[in-house]
């Protein structure tokens, strides 16, 4: 796993870098685990833009990923390590002894031919899945469930890992990559290890076109718009009109708390960005 850079034959090529994809062992995905995926262009069912600056991009097929890891006690062998256009991490194809095939997020260091297991008796090694109850404190984990049986929702991006800090009663304290420490029930599952493709953060797109390939359209600042389009638009030169920076709908963008989920506030032991 490394990064390729290129001779500066053009201004874009000067800062252009890509993964060397050396860990990839197969080009064509498993057909039985593919689904058609249609692009929304950031529009909802009414055709209105709900997510700005989205659209275009290369056509992709969705790989069905097993985030639940619910084949308990059934060993599986790693058949391939593959590229997934829908996420930053690599994925691994598992062949279970009962004949079933499933994709999982590939942890860092996973090799073809390794045997993985989802069980309370599984070894503490990358790729194995256990409930937090049977994972020792200090272990690096990813693909962490928030609700028992729902499947992993936390810590799934390339190169990230959470750390199991401590256990208290029915809950474990997990330190997330953001620095937040959160309580998660001991019956929730997690996978051992760090997510693969840790060099992803060091890749430079190099040119605007690569953003377009990913379905990202140009992002325009509010201060450059007309007053009809944004509260901070208009004026001769750059001027905010005297108001604080805000979104197109008037919501303050500097320091305003937007989280509105009191039901799970008690699960946050320490918020991200706090010292001590």
Curated annotation (Swiss-Prot):
One of its GO terms (biological process) is cytoplasmic translation. The keyword rRNA-binding applies. GO terms for molecular function: rRNA binding; structural constituent of ribosome; transferase activity. Residues 34-49 have a biased composition (Polar residues). Keywords: Ribonucleoprotein, Ribosomal protein, RNA-binding, rRNA-binding. GO terms for cellular component: large ribosomal subunit. Pfam families: Ribosomal_L2, Ribosomal_L2_C. SUPFAM superfamilies: Nucleic acid-binding proteins, Translation proteins SH3-like domain. Residues 29-54, 212-258 are annotated as: Disordered. Part of the 50S ribosomal subunit. Forms a bridge to the 30S subunit in the 70S ribosome. One of the primary rRNA binding proteins. Required for association of the 30S and 50S subunits to form the 70S ribosome, for tRNA binding and peptide bond formation. It has been suggested to have peptidyltransferase activity; this is somewhat controversial. Makes several contacts with the 16S rRNA in the 70S ribosome. NCBIfam families: rplB_bact (TIGR01171). Belongs to the universal ribosomal protein uL2 family. This is Large ribosomal subunit protein uL2. It comes from Sorangium cellulosum (strain So ce56).
